[in-house]
Amino acid sequence: MIRILSSEWLKTKRTAVRWITFFMPVVTALCIVAYISGRAGVTADFVYEGFFTVWTAVIIPLGAGLLAGFIIHEEELAGGFHGFLNSEVSRDSVYLGKFFLLIFCLMSCTFISTVILCAGMNLAAPGNGYYAVFMTAALFAVIGSLPILAIHLWISLLWGIGASIGTGMGGLLMGALIGATSLGDKIWILVPWAWPVKLSMFPAVYLLSRTDPAFGDTVRQMMTGLAAVVTGTAVFLTGGMIWFRKWEGRA
């Protein structure tokens, strides 16, 4: 699988995929650091909530749509999927290779941005942060995004880059309204685009006392969210792989 992932990464050379993976998170983090530097009395809680809300509700839905769309679009341009579908590698391995490439890109994006943000916070407001909590939240954001990546990979193959980007824009609205506001308090568990938003907030439980009434409730919600992510990833990834075994390209 490492060899397949390496091969998939080589295909992204001179494409927008690498720009999205490495350039976009740097710009995003630097903009936030500049904002922090220009304000007095900024707290770690404020930065934590603001950054991860924007990242999970806006950047991840749009980024997943763009990354999946571009990765599959490159295969479409390279002979209309013929080389892609007629590879000596099994269909399941090809599909998983694309999925793991998406995970690698999203993970790189998220951790690059978070590390730069933490470094910037340390310069702008020394000692004003819980950096382990930030990194844990970044990990939870990536984990919560796995079902979304599986959905976008399937959509990109089935309908193309336009559908993937369009779905990402719809996911942005769902993530912002259902994941980031009280409107979705009772239904967020049913909406995959709300999962990274909610999961990225749960590591803040570290800042609560274990005797706080909210502590136990937060932990229970976190476990429910993780169970939903595991189930969603299994369903969408397995469904996509079964469908891909018989797929012969778009007409």
Language-model features and meaning:
Residues 39-40, 73-76, 80, 116, ...:
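Membrane-interfacial segments
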